[in-house]
Amino acid sequence: MPAVGDDFPTPHNTEKSADSPMPPDEVCRTAKLPPGFELAVFAAEPDVQNPIAITFDERGRLWVAENFTYAGANAGWFDANLRDRVIILEDADGDGRHDKRTVFWDQGRKLTSVEVGFGGVFVLCPPQLLFIPDTNRDDIPDGPPQVLLNGFAEGVVGHNIANGLKWGPDGWLYGRHGIQETSLIGPPAATESQRAKINTGIWRYHPVHRKVEAVMHGMTNSWGFDYDQHGEMFCINTVIGHLWHVVPGARTERMYGIDFNPHAYQLIKQCADHVHWDTGELWHQVQKGISSTTDAAGGGHAHSGLLIYQGDNWPKEYRHKAYTLNMHGRRINCDRIEPYLAGFVAKHEPDFAHFADPWFRGIDLIAGPDGGVYIADWSDTGECHDHDGVHRTSGRIYKLTYGKPTPTQRVDLRAMPLLDLADLLASGNTWLKRAASLELSYRMQEAKSPLPSDLLSFEVANGGEQNLVHVIRMTMNLAAQESRSLPQEFCDELVQMAQNDPAGLTCLYLAAALQQMEVDHRWTLAEQLAARKEFSDDRMFPIMLWLGIESAVTQSPHKAVALAQLSHIPLLTQNLARRLTLEIERDPKTVTKLLDVAIGTECAHPHEIILGMSHALNGWRKAPAPANWSQAAQKFSASDLTEVKQAVQQLSIVFGDGVALDTLSQLATNGGAQPEARRQALRALLASKPTGFAATLHGLLGDRAVAVEVLRGLALYDDPSTPEKILAALGIYPPDARAEAVNTLATRPEYARALL
């Protein structure tokens, strides 16, 4: 199949409205901007239509992914009769408006993103990540696309589809994934165990080592990320919060569903201290219009695109701030990112720009070679899901500048000598810096030059927080590229860092590094980090520390008990107790030792042990009582903390006569309770198979948090209405629940007939 064909289907509009978008020049005239800023039309229909993603190449040309196959929520999401394409827009004379348009490839379907580098073009067309080689750079593909990865969910996925290719400062190609479905991503020949599993969050791919991995799990449907001058990545999101700091191994809050790790007891909240909508409203109310309170807060919860401006065109007071396109509010929100404890906090700044065009649907924004910001406008009337059809024949790229920037001299980084490229790494022009870094990575790969062995020396520019963080990140990246754990000598250096470095960000990355260490090597570093009580209230550090040690707990329970005793991080103490108590039937002696620590005088947070035990056994009907429970109960019943007294009462029941079935049923059906406690309550109830419980289970079929247990329980009850009710809810289930639904429907001939 040719890269560009004469048979490209003519895009047609399904938009129900008879209105038309505001003329592009009028959009620029009516936009409300800060003093001194100008908005200009870089390109507009028919030269660009439905721009879903934009990027620049090493020559400063704008590449645009045009998506025509998207059909909206009421048309099956995608139209198989159409195709998508990648075009190149070039401003040869530097006047701020494109004067050359080239169609590079028009064979795409479900195209969501484009990125250029390493001798070709990367395009994301779920279920595949494709690479289109163009080594001679003649803008004609050298051959058919190569499938680098497959397994991206796309069958039932609409607006939450995988998206967002962007080069990271580490040479990896990053992408995003929405919440509607779970993907198993890997090279075409990879087995299931060799694939990266992701449901919602951030993933990345290494173009040389051909390795893919999940970076961060959580959020809702991220459609934008960028990184600051130090390489710290941030991503944008919708509904539940809008800005997260991306740290490898993090697990964040999510709109719905359950994290893959059942022992991720707490999920990380956003780093912004505010939201852009009135949370007293339901999230979907904005579809009917923006209330005055949501307008004042920022325009709505739906965001697309993220730019941390680091160019040299905008005045200094606008630099190093985060800018995102607010979908419903038709504006650019602005947040100020500041260091806070072990990470960052984002503070609300006045909205940067407002667009009067009712059709304005900003979807991406990036800085260009001259420091101007390019904004991709989908140009349509629908909101996030396009219930009213798609207007495929409109689309714009605007350019936002301070004044009229001096036309940049045309550049071609591929033609530059190596030393000149290296000089650009210190440039104040971030576009040049990033493009030079990518070009250097490509040349290193072409020359097959290994990274110098002393790259990770700890004598880095006289130390300093950002330098140490950079060293940790680089070493983690190298280990990930080679699919190995961190070397022991480096782990020893990490322990020294934890002892001697006062910086919170260093500690945060040390906690992240735990997940890449051999399990047996994690304890010494964890002990040092557990002493950093000044970061116990940080929104990320305690959780990252727990996630780093969690998988080692049951392998070395005696070390876990010792860590609980010396920990000055309350959440860590609680989670250690919680995880150990879950093993009470298999390993009751360890729980007794844990209580000895709580009863003793050397534990900094003994009440957290009781709370952790209570969380662990919430939903249990009965558990064996530790030998020293009466002594512990006597001590903590006298606590001044109400929640500790309540925990003692609950544990005494579980360790005594057991919890009543009615109490378990109330917990199981309480949608506001902890998901794992509800699941455990269902398991305990179903073990006794209470009479008439099928009706209760039917009422829970739409509850994703307990779907597996509910479906498994329905197999115990013969009820003729069960098949119909299961099949009606099947579309909302993740893969494990769908598999359980099939198992249940296969338990009886009449159920199986309904399935068939």
Regions found by a protein language model. Give the residues of each.
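Beta-propeller domains with acidic blade repeats across secreted/periplasmic ectodomains
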Residues: 2-421, 431-442
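Long, ordered, helix-rich scaffold segments
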Residues: 376, 393, 400-756
